Design a protein with these regions (language model features):
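Extracytoplasmic beta-rich repeat domains
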Residues: 1-22, 29-30, 47-62, 69-80, ...
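Extracellular carbohydrate-recognition regions
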Residues: 327-352
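Extracellular glycan-recognition surfaces and repeat-rich motifs
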Residues: 344-376
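Secretory/extracellular carbohydrate-interaction modules
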Residues: 368-435
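Short, aromatic/His-centered strand-loop micro-motif at the edge of beta-sheets
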Residues: 432-454
Length: 512
């Protein structure tokens, strides 16, 4: 909702609460700011610029005070790290006006604060636990709970339950001047002589404590205690003021739709007042744009053309001087083909400014260039996630600059076919972060040459067979698959797509 992104990967989790009768969503963000948004409409209420880097710590709200922390460079000094208390009643940029207190040089970059009975407990990146006076920020006491602080402290049964990255699990009894250690264990790997890394916090429920580690999931509780899952009690978020009768914001619901050619979709319009409070449903006038053959009735029912091709457009609802838009993607039955002669397909999902259609050798092709942010890997999805039992194919072309060569590939049902430039290999993989399945084969290939890629996934009983094929575009398609992988825990469906790592230009054409 605001500034330039400083980090592309942050982990702050937002919270919801009521401040001054207004329901807010409060969150740390990738631009180093804490934002308060109207929870139902997303309108920004205030922002507080805390760090020059992204925020990973989740904020805590108590009444009209927000507690937040980070471990990077502060915006107003070279000091690293800070814990702050923010007056949550402001509007606009409250950085200079609504800070209640700060605790300097506390590198609390991952672990989120815990508030209990007037004390704010924080764990810094070196696993030092601090108890702060929540009203003033003064340090009441501190103690070491290990060497690497990632997880957050948890309060239960009058005690602090703390995990530390190097396998340490502690139960502490806090007091006014310190904490007494009641128990300390080190979780171990079962088949290796080392500790099991722990990144998650304790979870409390059903008379048990749950903790996850590299070695497994542990449930801690009295032996023989019966387990009975039951709904929890919703927290009291505070009293929200009554809505007025004057709309200031409209929402079209559903806001985004994937439809098949010939489908009908019902839309409704919701109205909210200046405080982001729900007023009610509204009767609206409707228009439809960029959906060939589509029409929408006076009561908001969109009908797509039975013979519609793949496309994307919008429906707009107007009430008085207000309007709101819903996005619609329409997909025809297979087969599909795309040669980019009409530009970038509007129904494709993903990508960014480094993607464009341009002319090469008299043909329109899809170019993916280097990213301005330095994040050169992009995946672009072409259809609904419910698709299965299909084959995806494309012509691809990769450039070279010095020793730098890109990767280029296809996506089918959550499986990626990756033609790797610097490694000169073809890989089939799923879940790139962990490479849940991975098969590869040596495959020398040349830059500045068009190749054809083909990826097919077959669900066979309780497994999936993934087949990939590569050949020079000007040559005949080989009868044998270049690489095959078997997945015993298969992805049953997923969108087709194209993918590439492109510090230099790559091109796609004739995608089908």
């Amino acid at each position: 909702p605001g500034g330039t992104v400083a980090d592309m990967n942050t982990q702050s989790v937002g919270i919801v609460g009521v401040v001054n009768g207004q329901r807010l969503w409060i969150d740390g963000n990738a631009d180093g700011r804490i934002y308060a948004l109207k929870a139902r409409t997303g309108e920004k209420v205030w922002e507080f610029h805390l760090s020059k880097r992204g925020i990973n710590v989740s904020p805590v709200l108590d009444g009209d005070t927000v507690y937040a922390a980070h471990s990077e460079e502060n915006i107003d000094s070279g000091i690293m790290g800070r814990v702050v208390a923010i007056d949550a009643t402001g509007t606009g940029d409250v950085t200079a006006t609504h800070e209640r207190w700060r605790a300097e040089e506390m590198a609390v970059g991952f672990s989120s604060p815990l508030l209990h009975n007037g004390s704010l407990y924080v764990i810094d990146n070196s696993a030092n636990l601090f108890s702060l006076d929540a009203a003033t920020g003064a340090v009441q006491w501190d103690t070491s709970v290990g060497t690497v602080g990632k997880a957050s402290p948890v309060w239960a049964d009058g005690k602090l339950f703390i995990t530390e990255t190097n396998g340490n699990v502690r139960i502490l009894q806090p007091g006014p001047n310190g904490a007494t250690e009641l128990d300390h264990d080190e979780l171990q790997m079962r088949d290796e002589d080392r500790y099991a890394e722990v990144y998650g916090s304790f979870a409390v429920g059903y008379g048990r404590l749950y903790v996850t580690s590299e070695a497994g999931i542990y449930a801690i509780g009295a032996s023989g205690t019966p387990f009975a899952a039951r709904a929890g009690t919703a927290p009291d978020l505070g009293g929200e003021a009554a809505a007025t009768s004057t709309p200031t914001v409209l929402q079209v619901v559903p806001a985004e739709v994937i439809a098949s050619a010939g489908d009908s979709v019902e839309f409704e319009v919701r109205a909210y007042d200046a405080g982001g409070r729900f007023i009610g449903m509204q009767e609206a006038s409707w228009t439809v744009e960029d959906l060939a053959g589509g029409s929408i009735s006076a009561n908001g029912v969109l009908t797509t053309a039975a013979g519609a091709t793949n496309q994307a457009g919008t429906v707009t609802a107007t009430v008085g001087g207000l309007s709101a838009v819903g996005q619609v993607r329409v997909y025809a039955p297979l087969p599909w083909s795309e040669n980019f002669e009409n530009g970038r397909p509007p129904q494709w999902i993903g990508g960014g400014g480094s993607l464009a259609v341009e002319e090469v050798d008299g043909n329109q092709v899809f170019r993916k260039g280097a990213s301005r942010t330095g994040i050169h890997r992009h995946a672009i999805y072409m259809g609904p996630t419910s698709m299965s039992g299909y084959t995806v194919q494309a012509d691809v072309f990769a450039t070279q600059r010095g020793r730098r060569r890109p990767d280029i590939g296809l996506i089918n049902s959550g499986y990626t076919m990756d033609l790797q430039g610097n490694r000169q290999k073809l890989m089939i993989q799923s879940w790139a972060a962990e490479l849940r399945i991975q098969e590869e084969v040596e495959f020398p290939w040349e830059p500045n040459t068009w190749y054809t890629l083909k990826l097919r996934v077959d669900n066979e009983g309780d497994r999936a067979i993934v087949r990939a094929k590569v050949w020079p575009r000007d040559g005949a398609e080989p009868s044998d698959w270049t690489l095959t992988a078997e997945d015993p825990v298969p992805n049953r469906s997923g969108s087709p797509g194209i993918i590439g790592y492109s510090p230099i230009d790559i091109y796609f054409d004739n995608v089908s």
